[in-house]
A protein has these predicted regions:
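Active-site capping/gating regions of soluble enzymes
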Residues: 20-21, 57-131
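Catalytic activation segment of kinase domains across protein kinase-like and atypical kinase folds
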Residues: 10-68
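Conserved kinase catalytic-core helix
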Residues: 1-8
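Long, compositionally biased intrinsically disordered regions
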Residues: 98-173
Length: 173
């Protein structure tokens, strides 16, 4: 998913309940997304696809600015999926959440080497908070995710970032 995001500007709304996880020796080996709620294209990447399929922007509401898509992908793939898998595995006692978070942080640092301009990865590693969808707040604001414009369909809140590291701890070599 990180390759698709950085190469083609595609982000998927992967939800934890739509993930199939293959375990080997009690640890994740392979992750499959059996379904997703939707997808986004980063506007700056979408020129060619929009020429072929202009309805992606007007009808599917699938194209958005980079900051918007960063926020959604950060929430759906990392906050809603990966961090919840880390929580579930950590609860087994085989390994701690902190150890798993360190593995994820290491992976993101490697990805930052590959994609040094990635605002997505920079946000995951350096921001003090991460976006999370406030389902109750969304309902209290009487928003309907199925019919509201994509940029206003949900209420997002900021919660502490468990992946945060200091920028001085990262080598860009």
């Amino acid at each position: 998913l990180m390759y698709l995001y950085h190469r083609f500007g595609m982000a998927f709304e992967s939800h934890q309940q739509n993930v199939l996880l293959e375990l080997e020796n009690h640890f994740p080996k392979t992750l499959w997304l059996r379904d997703n709620q939707g997808f986004y294209y980063i506007e700056e990447f979408a020129t060619e696809i929009l020429q072929a399929l202009p309805e992606l922007k007007e009808k599917a509401f699938a194209v958005g600015p980079k900051a918007f898509v960063d926020e959604r992908f950060s929430y759906y793939f990392f906050g809603n999926t990966i961090l919840k898998i880390i929580n579930a595995i950590g609860a087994t006692g085989y390994i701690t959440e902190d150890e798993l978070l360190a593995h994820l942080t290491g992976f993101l640092e490697e990805q930052l080497q590959q994609y040094p301009e990635s605002t997505l990865i920079q946000g995951l590693l350096f921001n003090s908070t991460l976006p999370y969808k406030g389902n109750l707040l969304t309902r209290l604001h009487e928003l309907d995710e199925l019919i509201a414009p994509v940029e206003n369909q949900s209420v997002y809140v900021q919660l502490p970032n468990p992946l945060r590291i200091s920028q001085k701890d990262v080598s860009y070599a």
